[in-house]
Amino acid sequence: MLKRKPSNVSEKEKHQKPKRSSSFGNFDRFRNNSLSKPDDSTEAHEGDPTNGSGEQSKTSNNGGGLGKKMRAISWTMKKKVGKKYIKALSEEKDEEDGENAHPYRNSDPVIGTHTEKVSLKASDSMDSLYSGQSSSSGITSCSDGTSNRDSFRLDDDGPYSGPFCGRARVHTDFTPSPYDTDSLKIKKGDIIDIICKTPMGMWTGMLNNKVGNFKFIYVDVISEEEAAPKKIKANRRSNSKKSKTLQEFLERIHLQEYTSTLLLNGYETLEDLKDIKESHLIELNIENPDDRRRLLSAAENFLEEEIIQEQENEPEPLSLSSDISLNKSQLDDCPRDSGCYISSGNSDNGKEDLESENLSDMVHKIIITEPSD
């Protein structure tokens, strides 16, 4: 019988078995060395000619070298990132505490990993603290912010200039508690400009350029009829000297800024102000209610002054009225006169005529009364 020759495959397998064991042994040895010395492992592997026989041993060595290179690169990147992070933390601590940061040594990989873990834990704890503070202080900051906004508005804004819905005179003193900052301190005789009236009884007003609350039971509301004569009297005093032009008239009542608007809208003379009304002033964009009242009251006073001057320019009827008032007592003492003038010659005939008229009247009355009986 013929004997078959052994194939090349079987021969290769016999020769490759020790090579595989040696390659795996070298791989384990290099892996253990890489844990202790990661930086020198690549150089030792590249310069170590242990496996110089066969193509398959070269491919296995190349694969192991790539894995070691990747591990070495990852270690170096971790070191660099850890160093940068530690430097950033140290700089922040130096800025906060004003102390010099202690240098860290990261030459050993174990120390580097330990510092990385510590820094990561510290950063996580700091982030959690900051987030907790922000979340817990969110509600309080909102509430404090609103109160601070209100206080800033009261402090920064100027005095309230209107609108007002009336005026009130205080008849009872009231001093609020020191904790009540919204209420007004009022005294008897103070006049408060009312801003708002609420059905609860707490009104809002302004006193001495301060806006606050007060109870309606401490005040008496001043009607417009009571307030109007006071303004008219003041304007009469200011207009004691008659103004001739519109500009002089407005300067006397301290409203000269409205001269241009009045002149442009047809109010050129003082006579044009006779028929002016509040609606006309609103159409002229005079928004301040106090200015409108002053202008209207001044125009009314100007008309009254003209009427008084016209009466003074007519002395005869005034003198007659005075004479009549003086001689009234004398006229009451005199007998009444019929208005007919009777001469002395015809006095007897006049008496007879009067008697005949009286007789005829009496007869007529008697005739009328008889049938009624």
From Swiss-Prot:
The modification Phosphotyrosine is found at residue 160. The modification Phosphothreonine is found at residue 76. SUPFAM superfamilies: SAM/Pointed domain (SSF47769), SH3-domain (SSF50044). One of its GO terms (biological process) is negative regulation of peptidyl-tyrosine phosphorylation. Residues 123-146 have a biased composition (Low complexity). It comes from Homo sapiens (Human). The gene is SAMSN1. Interacts with FASLG. Interacts with phosphotyrosine containing proteins. Interacts (via SH3 domain) with CTTN. Interacts (phosphorylated at Ser-23) with YWHAB, YWHAE, YWHAG, YWHAH, YWHAZ and SFN. Interacts directly with SAP30 and HDAC1. Identified in a complex with SAP30 and HDAC1. Induction: Up-regulated in peripheral blood B-cells by IL4, IL13 and by CD40 stimulation. It comes from the Eukaryota. GO terms for cellular component: cytoplasm; cytosol; nucleus; ruffle. Residues 241-305 form the SAM domain. Disulfide bonds: none annotated. It is found in: Nucleus; Cytoplasm; Cell projection, Ruffle. The lineage of its organism: Eukaryota, Metazoa, Chordata, Craniata, Vertebrata. Negative regulator of B-cell activation. Down-regulates cell proliferation (in vitro). Promotes RAC1-dependent membrane ruffle formation and reorganization of the actin cytoskeleton. Regulates cell spreading and cell polarization. Stimulates HDAC1 activity. Regulates LYN activity by modulating its tyrosine phosphorylation. This is SAM domain-containing protein SAMSN-1.
